[in-house]
Each structure stands twice: as structure tokens, then as C-alpha cells.
A protein has these predicted regions:
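Helix-to-loop junction immediately C-terminal to a conserved catalytic motif
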Residues: 4
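H-loop/switch region of ABC-family ATPase nucleotide-binding domains
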Residues: 147-148
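H-loop (His-switch) and adjacent beta-strand-loop-beta switch element
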Residues: 159-173
Length: 197
């Protein structure tokens, strides 16, 4: 959230390409957790995905035919074409997640932030999402995801950062994803859960 300028850093600053977030926001896309979204808001799948174009078009300008075509393409990439006119409140959890992934894709960003992109989705949806993320990586894009399923870290990611209040370890997954770093990260989990309850 600090990197996305949603909360202020305690100290220092966050830079992308040596620029502040406000200067490069059109190069950054964000997929939030499903739980942080009002799914009862009356809008369609197409409308939600099309909102991803507003950063390039401008909030007070009308989207062009090209923007609408790009919206259709993004919806197709996540396999949601038949749901294009469906209200988002009528979608399953996995379908909702794919809609927000499509909204990120239509932004044509360089960096993609994803907050628990696989949470609450079935294995088929998870596979389709990871296939899309791998394509982005192969296109030279950067994908940063919050992810807690230790079973899939090695399969899904090239780099890993372990955080427990502060950074425990960070680097290539084959070097950093070790039992020692996992233990350092999770050793006080039960204590912190008790403190937070």
C-alpha cells in the first residue's frame, strides 16, 4: 500500500524509475483483494474493465472505439466474454477476480501489483490467472503479488520477499525460499495473532 501511495511511508520515499508514484501512475496497475471491493455497486463487467482505460483517456473524456476494443480484448484474455453484460454482483468469487485482472490488463501497465490474487478462487481459475501472469513476465512486465500459499511459491514466482514486521529476506526464490527464512517469518505468527485478537 505504501508503494501504491495509499499510505504514507514511516520514513524515506518510494520511487519508480527514479520518479514518485504520481509521475508514473499510468505505468502501474493494481488488483485489490476481493474483500475490499463493494460488489453490490450496480455496474457491469464491461464497465468495470473499461474503467482501467480512464488513466490513459482522462476521467472527463469519453472512451474511444479503440479503448472499447481493448476492453473487449482484456475481457477475452481472462475468459469472461460471455459475462460482459453481467452485473458484477452476480459473479462468483473467481469470476470477480478475473474481472479485476482484466481491468489491470487493459491499463497496459509496466508494473502490476496484486493483493492476494488467488484468494478464494478454484484451482482452474488459479491456473488461468498464473498463466496470464507468466505471459506478462515474458513480455518484460513486473508482477508483484502478496501471496501466502507456501506450496506454490517456487512454481509461481522468480523472486520472493519474506516480511514479518520488517523484511526478513529478499532475493531469487531458489536462494531465499529456505526452511530457515520460512521459520524466521512465521515463528511469531501465533503470538501476533493473539495480540491482534
Amino acid at each position: 500500500k505504501t508503494m501504491l501511495n495509499l499510505i504514507k511511508p514511516v520514513t524515506g520515499e518510494v520511487l519508480f524509475y527514479n520518479e514518485k508514484y504520481s509521475k508514473v501512475r499510468n505505468k502501474i496497475a493494481y488488483v485489490p483483494q476481493r474483500g475490499s471491493v463493494d460488489w453490490d455497486f450496480p455496474t457491469t463487467v464491461f464497465d468495470v474493465v473499461e474503467m482501467g482505460r480512464y488513466g490513459k483517456v482522462g476521467w472527463l473524456k469519453r472512451v474511444s472505439k479503440i479503448d472499447k476494443e481493448k476492453t473487449k480484448e482484456a475481457i477475452a484474455k481472462v475468459g469472461m466474454e460471455e459475462f460482459s453484460d453481467r452485473q458484477i454482483s452476480q459473479l462468483s468469487g473467481g469470476q470477480q477476480q478475473r474481472v479485476f485482472l482484466a481491468r489491470a490488463l487493459v491499463q497496459e501497465a509496466e508494473i502490476y501489483f496484486m493483493d492476494e490474487p488467488f484468494q478464494g478462487v478454484d484451482s482452474k481459475t488459479e491456473k488461468s490467472i498464473i498463466d496470464i501472469l507468466k505471459k506478462l513476465r515474458n513480455e518484460g512486465k513486473t508482477v508483484i503479488a502478496v501471496h501466502h500459499d507456501l506450496q506454490t511459491v517456487k512454481e509461481y514466482f522468480d523472486y520472493v520477499t519474506f516480511i514479518n514486521v520488517s523484511v526478513v529476506a529478499s532475493g531469487p526464490v531458489e536462494e531465499i525460499f529456505t526452511p530457515e527464512n520460512i521459520e524466521k517469518t512465521y515463528k511469531n505468527k501465533k503470538l501476533s495473532e493473539r495480540e491482534g485478537s
